[in-house]
């Protein structure tokens, strides 16, 4: 009997335990590798800003680095369309084999890329192009892996089985942080010169292993059954988004599930790292170590909440996570500030910093295309304060008034960097978080709470998304809202939040972005999202 016939014969039955384990392991390992590749850039954003955006000031360079990071997210929905269509037409297995090769090659090339000092403006242009290739590949990876695992999972265990795919993003982040820390340790002062390239070059080894394992997989039984019955879609994109009954479900998935889930995930694993290092001035090595510890503690909960969704439903778990995110983000991040840099907290209470300026001279420093110039005295003052991690408030001055900075009782006219440094030093503002004063246990506890919230939203996600759509258009239909949510809502979280902080001076103001998104998702989900755990995905 042929392999095709053997697989087809089991299409309507559950997979064996050994086959299920192999499917989960092979799919998850490859997805861990893709997330490792994708997250490396985020872990090295500060270094990359110096290597590839050297022609601008430090704050603008960091914003550009975040924008390049976000560029990979922008194209993810397009990857979802391209590879989703292929996955629904030619099969799940071969499609997500292509995505892993594309991701691995693009990441390896980043490790070989000359810097701005070597080839000038071509360096950031090529970097962004490679980031976009990574995003294109990741746009096709998740839908393929989630669909493939779910279509092999026995009824009643889809949440548990697909939650392993959900945990891969966290494991990929953990792997990237561990590799970066190891490279920092072994290369020392040379890390920012050439050592940062090693994590990117190392990806070629992971690519070889992941590709070899995926080559041994068989096609999804549900897909083969559909093909044998002649029910495969000839135009999955048109069918997914051109028919209102399907488009309506896509929109519900985007606004009730993916938008909110995305910001909870990136708040817990990306924005928190930016917050600790950029605004609270924690030593990057310590911040990475505390995040690693938190991720190790939090990772199993992605599996737990996937399992729990098999017992009580997908919707209750997801809605609880969104509710907690909306209610707790401000208290959690204020707690991080208190336990990370108490000296900064005390100084800001005793000698608050106020920037008095004509609002027309102050720019909102969000520049997706890199053409704006932030060089007014107001912009320079705010850039300096944010670069130093100093919280401040803004006050409007009459039109045409020069900028004035107050540090407690000290007044400084215009942008005078020396005078500003002297004033903040006199007021007791620390230049960095004192490692001895960081309450490491409480920082880990608060990050773990963020991860638990993310796990509630992310753990049941793959099963829920697979169950919403029919087999013939499943890959395409679930991939697009997922990657719009994660690529746009989540991917721009660090950049938008950072720009909000620069504009207002309030290090917590950027949290309004995730709070609003999770709040909207909560309301839409409560009224529009249906429960799906009992759906028969083989026959819908």
What role is predicted for each listed range?
Residues 66-85, 104-106, 171, 292-305:
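Central cavity-lining transmembrane alpha-helices of secondary-active solute carriers
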Residues 113, 119-139, 343-357, 440-456:
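Hydrophobic core of transmembrane alpha-helices in multi-pass small-molecule transporters
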Residues 137, 159-184, 206, 332, ...:
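Glycine-rich segments within core transmembrane alpha-helices of 12-TM secondary carriers
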Residues 41-42, 246-295, 332-333, 360-395, ...:
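Extracytoplasmic gate region of multi-pass secondary transporters
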Residues 45-76:
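Extracellular/periplasmic helix-loop-helix junction of adjacent transmembrane segments
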Residues 89-101, 311-322:
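Cytoplasmic membrane-interface "Motif A"-like loop-to-helix N-cap segments
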Residues 210-217, 332-339, 516-540:
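Multi-pass alpha-helical transporter architecture, strongest
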Residues 54, 101-120, 323-343, 426-435:
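C-terminal ends and interior cores of transmembrane alpha-helices
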